[in-house]
Amino acid sequence: MQQRDAADQAPGNLFVLSLTRVTQVDRDPDWVFRRLHDPETLLACVPGGSLTRVIDAERFEGRIVVGAGPFKFGYDGDGRITESDPAARTASLRLHGLDVRHVPDVRIRMSMAVHGHSSGSEVQMSFWVTVVDRTGLLNRGWVDPIANDLLDRTVRRIKQELEGTTGDRPA
């Protein structure tokens, strides 16, 4: 589902997207939560993503390269786990690309919930993505498919990574 209530603003454009995805993983829910709570595991599942530095238990830095055709944008940024409840298996985090001239500013808030499921775990993820394009070159026709494709590929990689790793299988 996408939110389309953002208006174009001069100079440049503001885009706000609200995206959700659900996937099932053939692993124990507590194990899945612990793995997804690790920034290195999570960023490794983002195409073009990598962890560059762990600051402390809640803060980290990373890099994500996003491409569309021949164009690529590299984002260095910081992340912070803003909420975590291991008993409920819920967590939230915030990612922010560092300001770079001539590159759209991107901020992401993500929340996840891991529930028990007949196949092991169900992972529900919600993303709120804000893109500020100061150049005025981007339009929603480019932003929506790029964001959706990146998220779809991330969710597929989460499932593949977790199911391809030795871990607790459901009873």
Protein language model regions, located:
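Hydrophobic ligand-binding cavity/cleft-lining segments
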Residues: M1-R59, G69
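Extended beta-strand/beta-hairpin segments
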Residues: Q2-R4, D8-L19, V65-A68, D78-R80, ...
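A generic structural micro-feature
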Residues: N13-F15, V54, G69-Y75, D85, ...
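Intrinsic-disorder/low-complexity, polar/charged segments enriched in Ser/Thr/Lys/Arg/Asp/Glu/Gln
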Residues: V16-V22, R59, G74-D76, A88-T90, ...
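Hydrophobic pocket/interface hotspot
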Residues: V32-L36, L42, G62, I81, ...
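Glycine-rich portal/gate segments that line the openings of hydrophobic small-molecule binding cavities
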Residues: R53-G97
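Beta-strand/loop substructures that line and gate deep hydrophobic ligand-binding cavities in soluble
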Residues: E83, G97-N148
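A conserved amphipathic terminal alpha-helix motif
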Residues: V132-P170
